[in-house]
């Protein structure tokens, strides 16, 4: 890790994700040659959220590139929780379906946690079932949520030292921030590779002065709150690695067009950081790539379990 720099090295998540997808395509060919059936991922969208449609479309493109069979099931926003649960139960029982993801968010009348927990643990490629979250927390074998797993892969690819380093995770979502903190502090005694960082979690109730203080002490900052420009230049230690998970759609006043930005003031922070991820093109592509990783992993486990039973 560099601790002094005139300008941060931009972490090209798009290029790294392409490497991962290429590796996975090669791995899948090996699996099929060994007699494994083709993995099949089913995505479920409830309602007509344009962002959800785009995210799922990107996942389907990645499936085709890797060689994974896939389909998208679209349900109207009026779908009841019971109807969605029945669909998930049917997919759980279908041996041809090896991966299931329910694109979040779901309509307000549907309980997100209930839906995540309804997905079979072994087919839960998002890693959102409470069993997978619990296994991740205990450093056990699990389907780890794709975004924090993608961040971990980025850090490893860039050879960012984590052993004994101070890491700050800004945000406390159960699907991203919590498993991210868990991965950063993992000691490697069980299934999860050690990262051995000293981890601090900050959130909306962390006073701004305290947030700034914690960030200034951090060698690694991972921010995922959905607040444009939250992390500023004065909050970052020179040479720190800044990972921006935020995705915010804002209007560019100079052009009148909408654009995507993260939670980090990118142009300012890159002047002091050692490494930084852009938005778009940073964490997002890695999330999709690691979802493909989880899908292959899930398919292999299910086939192996059937052979041994």
UniProtKB/Swiss-Prot annotation:
Catalytic reactions of this protein: (6R)-5,10-methylene-5,6,7,8-tetrahydrofolate + NAD(+) = (6R)-5,10-methenyltetrahydrofolate + NADH; (6R)-5,10-methenyltetrahydrofolate + H2O = (6R)-10-formyltetrahydrofolate + H(+)
Q: Which InterPro entries match?
A: Aminoacid_DH-like_N_sf (IPR046346), NAD(P)-bd_dom_sf (IPR036291), THF_DH/CycHdrlase (IPR000672), THF_DH/CycHdrlase_cat_dom (IPR020630), THF_DH/CycHdrlase_CS (IPR020867), THF_DH/CycHdrlase_NAD-bd_dom (IPR020631)
| PROSITE patterns in the record | THF_DHG_CYH_1, THF_DHG_CYH_2
Q: Tell me which cofactor or cofactors this protein depends on.
A: Mg(2+)
Q: Where is this gene product found?
A: Mitochondrion
Report any one BP term from Gene Ontology: tetrahydrofolate interconversion
The task this protein performs is described as: May play a role in spermatogenesis.
Family in the record: Belongs to the tetrahydrofolate dehydrogenase/cyclohydrolase family.
Output this protein's name.
Answer: Bifunctional methylenetetrahydrofolate dehydrogenase/cyclohydrolase, mitochondrial
Q: Which organism is it from?
A: Drosophila melanogaster (Fruit fly)
